[in-house]
Amino acid sequence: MAVGLLALTVIVDRGQVLIAPVTLALVIGLMFGPLADRIERAGVPAPISAATIVLVFLTLISAVIATIVIPLTAWTERLPVIWARVQSILADWKDLMTTMDSMSASLQNALGQEGNAAEVKVDDGSAVENVAWLAPAIATQIVLFLASLYFFMATRHQLRSSVLGLCFDRRLRWRIAHVFRDVEALVSSYLISITAINIAMGACVAVAMALLGVPSPLLWGMLAGLLNYAIYIGPAIMAVIMLGVGLATGSSTTDYVAPMLAYLAVNMTEAQFVTPHVLGRTLTLNPFIVLLALAFWIWVWGPVGGFVAVPLLLIAAAAIRHVSPANHRRFALEANAEKN
């Protein structure tokens, strides 16, 4: 079993370019499955319904990216200011003076004086070259994702019928049908609910940042909502980002930590009260298992892994619920009880 898991990990890691976008498309397709069913019940053919959903999804994602990238690019120029603030704070700790001196020298070299202009140009050229090399691979993954999403949405009923047609045993066919039903219901319910929660939380973070006078409050609200898809890890990253924002914009210790504390207050309210109330007990998963899944999928697939980790756990839970031997016995007892 250990060898099989290791082999699966290697396959998932090495096949990221192919497997990651297809998996993401399947998860997104499960999310929009109920919407596609409603459109098709209105008499719209499945291919047109799938194309409509893909276009709407692509438009929304493009709008989100455009809203985030432009202000975020401007904020990257403040990184030297943030690092300088960190230096000035840590410099007050006498036991870290030696470390900070070396960091100061490294920072001055990285920022570059007039004589180091040529080095900065070389670094920029290298960055542009890296982007040029990565662009075709990224474009290929995007096209593969969109194509997979469209064809899955357009043919998902045929796929389900084909899989059920391979099951010659009636009881097995019944179980597999319930797996399909529960997978779509669980993943769709989870992603729609968590998306609504993240939008509301992002709006609250944006309002909080605006009240604190933090520049670009909409940016931080949208970023908080996006990172919240990767539970546990995403909020931790966002807290560090907000601390950096406070260091870049504040003038006192209170100003430094206020954005981070405001974000943590909103996030803790969402995590402790809103999410448990909205999702309920039906979608609760063991936090330790969730953390392990997040760590694993982020390790192999990065941000895409963070998004699909929980949906993949829900898919596995639905399959185990109907396929495990213990549930086989339970279903048999229920069937006998119904006959009697």
Predicted region positions:
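Anchoring transmembrane alpha helix of integral membrane proteins
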Residues: 1-70, 145, 165, 314-340
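Short amphipathic alpha-helical coupling elements at transmembrane boundaries
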Residues: 37-41, 74-77, 81-88, 92, ...
